[in-house]
Amino acid sequence: AQDRSNVILYPTSYGAQHHDTEWLIGKGRVLDPTEWFIIIPNMFGNGLSSSPSNLEAPYGPERWPVFTHWDNVHAQRRLLAEVFGIEHLALIYGWSMGAQQALHWGAIFPDQVARICAVCGSARTSIHNRVFLEGVRATLTGDPAWTGTHFTAHPTRGLRAMGRVYAGWAMSQAFYREKLYETVGFTSLEDFLVRSWEANFLRRDAHDLLASLETWLASDISVYALLLGVRERALGAITARSIIMPSRTDL
């Protein structure tokens, strides 16, 4: 719209880049580009925005800064204002880490967000979620190429194992019990694990995956000075009309 009143921000999730999330966009789909101006910012650490795999010295695969959602949200705000001249968002839609970014937006810049739809996200990474993430990290860094600070080669063994561990958390018990993977083109459980989960992680840079994992672990909308470190204050700062959508079968 000429008045820029129809802007939707759609941040990326863990291990995803903008082209992985475009399936929601299309005429008659959840995000309809004939009605909305949709922007997908690539999260720091995802391999397209600043990430261990593309940082210049003194940073890089052997050393990188911790990216936080504070960084993501402030960079996105500058992108919107300085590139597109956008000061107000009709909606922020996000899944998983994208939902975390949506909630951060709502707490940090409440006057600039009209609506939030946060799917399978959280205002703060829970202890149970941290257990999952630490298990995934231990699996990946168990590869022989891990030195304690970085990988000396593409950690094929660790990435394959990471995919298999992640698959047990990402999909529900009912999904496996009912063999729903067979309804989306896979011939067996092994075929699903190899062609979906192993393949997805094998095409990623392992250092980028670790950097994004650190962002996930650090996610907490209440830690910033303006919110005084109080979760209730942070949540109370959100004035946007919000849909917080958990999954009934989520682990």
Question: What is each residue range found by the language model?
Answer:
Residues 238, 244-246:
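Short beta-strand/loop motif that positions the catalytic acidic residue
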Residues 59-63, 70-91, 100-103, 108:
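Conserved acidic catalytic loop of the alpha/beta-hydrolase fold
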Residues 195, 211-234:
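Active-site nucleophile elbow and catalytic-triad environment of alpha/beta-hydrolase enzymes
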Residues 12, 94-95, 247:
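Conserved alpha/beta-hydrolase "nucleophile elbow" surrounding the catalytic nucleophile
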Residues 1-57:
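N-terminal cap/lid subdomain of alpha/beta-hydrolase-fold enzymes
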Residues 92-94, 119:
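Short beta-strand immediately N-terminal to the catalytic nucleophile in serine-hydrolase-like folds
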Residues 216, 248-251:
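Acidic catalytic loop of the alpha/beta-hydrolase fold
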Residues 112-113, 118-199:
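Alpha/beta-hydrolase-fold enzymes
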